[in-house]
Amino acid sequence: MQRFIKWLAVITSLDLLIVLLGGALVTKTGSGQGCGKSWPLCNGEFVPSNLSMETIIELSHRLTSGSAGILVTLLCILSWKYYKHVRETKTLAILSFVFLVAQALMGAAAVVWGQMPAVLAIHFGISLISFASVILLTCLIFEIDQKFDARSLIMDKKMKFHIYGVTIYSYIVVYTGALVRHERASLACPDFPLCSKNRPMPTQLHEWVQMGHRVAAMLIFAWILYAMILAIRHYKQQPVVYWGWIISFILVTLQAVVGVLVVFTNASLAMALLHSLFISCLFAVLCYLVMLGTRSKVNAKEAELTSKQTK
């Protein structure tokens, strides 16, 4: 059964990643109304008779979201049953399921009633939490923490501050990026790093949305760079923290490069999807570090108790 659960966890993680990228594809191609205003049917039909490209993209996104719902539900039930001895299992299972349902309902509401771009931008963030929760469940199932000896990990308050702070802030950056997509502001500023050669400062809403995201992205790049330097200096003996921050910096660098290329490639589809891919992976890595940070407090108490007993 454990072998089956491992395969299920991997397939579910991949399916949720496809759902995330599919949502970005729907937004990028303007396929949100590919099935009209009907849900769960497509243009009022179970199998649509008129298959335009927008309909195919929207319908594919709905099908992958539906399969993700089934897989996440099954994974939550099995992990709850067979891995309940691991402290975070139940919390992650609940988060995975609840946020997936919230994402599906919000997507359906956007189709039927329509939503403001500021509200639609939350849709990607909700999906991201479900994805990260499933990734963490997968890590627990594969016992990644044991391989990195994470059970004995103890972090100082400074490192935990950076882990929690960067993760929360990354969610804000994700929201600003999603807002750029839904406001159709990807090409509002044709230059980089300033908005335009003729107008370095933004003058209208779409330019402010674009430049706000750029500033937020630059700040998270600098913050992760600083945290990585701390990890390299002080956590070489803790490989999970050491490599966690190095991987985070690699991902945020790739994210930044692709973000610039989105501007200079006229918002090409490939760059837009890579932009969503890298931030999804980065958020999952940061959430894993958060989980380790919560364990660190427990590990410190256990170490202190053991020390008192030996005395």
Curated annotation (Swiss-Prot):
Its cofactor is heme b. Residues 28-62, 113-121, 181-211, 265-271 are extracellular. Pathway: Porphyrin-containing compound metabolism; heme A biosynthesis; heme A from heme O: step 1/1. It holds the Pfam family COX15-CtaA. Residues 1-6, 84-91, 143-159, 233-243, 293-311 are cytoplasmic. The chain crosses the membrane at residues 7-27, 63-83, 92-112, 122-142, 160-180, 212-232, 244-264, 272-292. Heme o binds at H61, H123. Disulfide bonds join C35-C42, C189-C195. It is a multi-pass membrane protein. It catalyses: Fe(II)-heme o + 2 A + H2O = Fe(II)-heme a + 2 AH2. Heme b binds at H213, H275. Its EC number is 1.17.99.9. It is found in: Cell membrane. Its main location: membrane. Interacts with CtaB. HAMAP family: HemeA_synth_type1. Catalyzes the conversion of heme O to heme A by two successive hydroxylations of the methyl group at C8. The first hydroxylation forms heme I, the second hydroxylation results in an unstable dihydroxymethyl group, which spontaneously dehydrates, resulting in the formyl group of heme A. The N-half (TM1-TM4) and C-half (TM5-TM8) domains are connected by an intracellular loop. Each domain is formed from four-helix bundles and they align in a pseudo twofold symmetry manner. The N-half domain is the substrate-heme O binding domain and the C-half domain is the cofactor heme B binding domain. This is Heme A synthase.
